């Protein structure tokens, strides 16, 4: 068990480096990795949080169907059991996705979670999809000192919780460089409309070949921006549309989609502000497991070979310091040869700018 002082600092009465606790994955005979997770959480101070009689949201990613890189449910049970020992009422949670797949509404999302092993017998607590059936059950909360987002649209169950814990699989990501704690919180806790605000600078579009003409999207639109053409296909008036994304959640046929046109730099900034909104004003604790470091997000229905060796478990009260510590550890690791990163490094003239992500 090691403690490291991350390079980020928290603003208190006096400035001091944030503490991030770390343990590796080495488990000699008689040593349990699950016990090591428990011990690093305790060392980092999870038992300092008063959980007695309080709802505890444990935010994690249940993995897209077909993906095998997501965190095992056994890890979630360790964290849930720690919460229950302290009198807490934990639940695992995530929000619906903006795009088509196996997690775009609560019913499919719950089925996906169960098929991937997340249900009360394996995790010790219930699973709640935080933004409801269609991804429209949200709370609009202020962003502290927000520059790019003044408010954030967060899954209501997450904001209803008294305590927030993130349990993150740290890996690569095709848009944000890496997917860590801030992404798990910021993007993951956004409702479908919240995800659209982070991803897109514009408005949703209609793929008319998929439109069934059911008119449900028009009923959900608060701006009267949706009409129907001569073929009974939805048309969005971009001059009236406010970009709330409720029509995306209303469509059962994946006919309405976000253009996802925010630049990656802007996406990262919005995501960080959303994470700040989720964490503000209540006790929070964060755990990241740096293992099965796939090059892309667990949102894919597949996962490529890891680009780096398994590194360890990190825990902290500071999500920024936690991401910094995980990223630093990855940048100091030797890339694996039979991987996307290893193959890229072997290409003549390919430049990774000293960054494994």
Predicted feature residues:
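Short, Lys/Arg-enriched N-terminal segments with co-localized hydrophobic residues
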Residues: 2-14
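Extended, low-polarity segments enriched in aliphatic/aromatic residues
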Residues: 16-67, 71-75, 85-93, 99-357
């Amino acid at each position: 068990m090691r403690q490291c002082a991350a390079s980020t600092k928290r603003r208190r009465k006096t400035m001091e480096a944030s503490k991030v606790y770390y343990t590796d994955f080495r488990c000699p005979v008689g040593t349990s990795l699950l016990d090591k997770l428990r011990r690093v959480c305790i060392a980092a101070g999870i038992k300092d949080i008063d959980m007695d009689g309080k709802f505890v949201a444990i935010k994690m990613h249940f993995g897209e169907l077909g993906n095998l890189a997501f965190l095992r449910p056994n890890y979630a049970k360790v964290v849930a059991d720690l919460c229950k020992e302290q009198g807490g009422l934990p639940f695992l949670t995530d929000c619906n996705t903006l795009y088509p797949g196996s997690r775009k509404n609560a019913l499919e999302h719950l089925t996906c979670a169960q098929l991937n092993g997340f249900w009360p017998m394996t995790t010790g607590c219930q699973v709640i999809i935080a933004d409801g059936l269609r991804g429209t059950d949200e709370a609009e909360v202020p962003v502290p000192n927000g520059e790019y987002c003044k408010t954030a649209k967060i899954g209501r169950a997450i904001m209803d919780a008294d305590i927030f814990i993130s349990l993150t699989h740290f890996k690569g990501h095709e848009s944000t460089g890496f997917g860590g704690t801030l992404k798990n919180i910021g993007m993951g806790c956004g409702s479908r409309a919240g995800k659209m605000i982070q991803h897109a600078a514009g408005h949703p579009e209609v793929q008319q070949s998929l439109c069934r003409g059911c008119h449900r999207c028009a009923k959900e639109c608060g701006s009267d921006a949706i009409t129907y053409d001569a073929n009974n296909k939805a048309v969005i008036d971009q001059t009236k549309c406010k970009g709330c994304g409720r029509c995306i959640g209303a469509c059962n046929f994946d006919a309405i989609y976000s253009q996802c046109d925010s630049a990656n730099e802007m996406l990262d900034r919005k995501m960080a502000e959303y994470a700040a909104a989720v964490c503000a004003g209540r006790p929070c604790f964060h755990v990241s497991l740096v293992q099965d470091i796939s090059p892309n997000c667990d949102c894919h229905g597949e996962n490529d070979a890891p680009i780096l060796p398994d590194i360890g478990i990190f825990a902290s009260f500071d999500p920024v310091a936690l991401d910094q510590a995980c990223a630093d550890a990855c940048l100091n690791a030797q890339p694996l040869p039979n991987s996307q990163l290893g193959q890229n490094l072997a290409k003549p003239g390919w430049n990774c700018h000293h960054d494994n992500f």
